[in-house]
From Swiss-Prot:
Organism, scientific name: Streptococcus equi subsp. equi (strain 4047)
Keywords attached to this entry: Cytoplasm, RNA-binding
Known function: Required for rescue of stalled ribosomes mediated by trans-translation. Binds to transfer-messenger RNA (tmRNA), required for stable association of tmRNA with ribosomes. tmRNA and SmpB together mimic tRNA shape, replacing the anticodon stem-loop with SmpB. tmRNA is encoded by the ssrA gene; the 2 termini fold to resemble tRNA(Ala) and it encodes a 'tag peptide', a short internal open reading frame. During trans-translation Ala-aminoacylated tmRNA acts like a tRNA, entering the A-site of stalled ribosomes, displacing the stalled mRNA.
Molecular function GO labels: RNA binding
Location of this chain's protein in the cell: Cytoplasm
Annotated protein name in UniProt: SsrA-binding protein
Cellular component aspect of the GO annotation: cytosol
Annotated family: Belongs to the SmpB family.
Family annotation (Pfam families): SmpB
PROSITE patterns: SSRP
Length: 155
């Protein structure tokens, strides 16, 4: 299975609008029992989340996993920092890339792969407002060109 495929449970839809995605990496997430049940129920939000590297370990921060309804006392803090499972050389590569100015790690999507929860992390650089407007303009122009070509080909 290729990266990013599987049963997609959550996506950060504005990520490609707000950031230039340079590279993506698949990582496992360390979750508690009730958290994985909430993730399987697609009760996860990636909107404000980001990843960081501390002491040679990757961590997922500000990702909200809603408490499992039947979990009562076993529920963990919905906003807790969760460890990401990556190989040492992947972590080192990402740490080296993050030293560049304006680079950050953002979660793009969460999905199940062979029964395990995985997160697709994107190495990204923030876009300026004029970049966002330019990409919208380019997308609309491409759409208009395709529409015209489609009508020409029908004749």
């Amino acid at each position: 299975m290729a990266k990013g495929e599987g049963n997609v449970l959550a996506q950060h839809k504005k990520a490609r609008h707000d950031y230039h995605i340079v590279e993506t990496v698949e990582a496992g997430i360390v979750l508690t029992g009730t958290e994985i049940k909430s993730v399987r129920a697609a009760r996860i939000q990636l909107k404000d989340g980001f990843a960081q590297i501390k002491n040679g370990e990757a961590w997922l921060v500000n990702v909200h996993i809603a408490p499992f309804e039947q979990g009562n006392i076993w529920n963990a803090d919905p906003e807790r920092t969760r460890k990401l499972l990556l190989k040492k050389r992947e972590i080192q590569h990402l740490a080296d890339e993050l030293k560049g100015t304006g680079m950050t790690l953002i979660p793009l999507k969460v999905y199940l792969k062979d029964g395990f929860a995985k997160v697709l992390i994107g190495l990204a650089k923030g876009k300026h407002d004029y970049d966002k407007r330019e990409s919208i303009k380019r997308r609309e122009q491409d759409r208009d060109i395709r529409r015209v070509m489609k009508s020409v080909n029908r004749r």
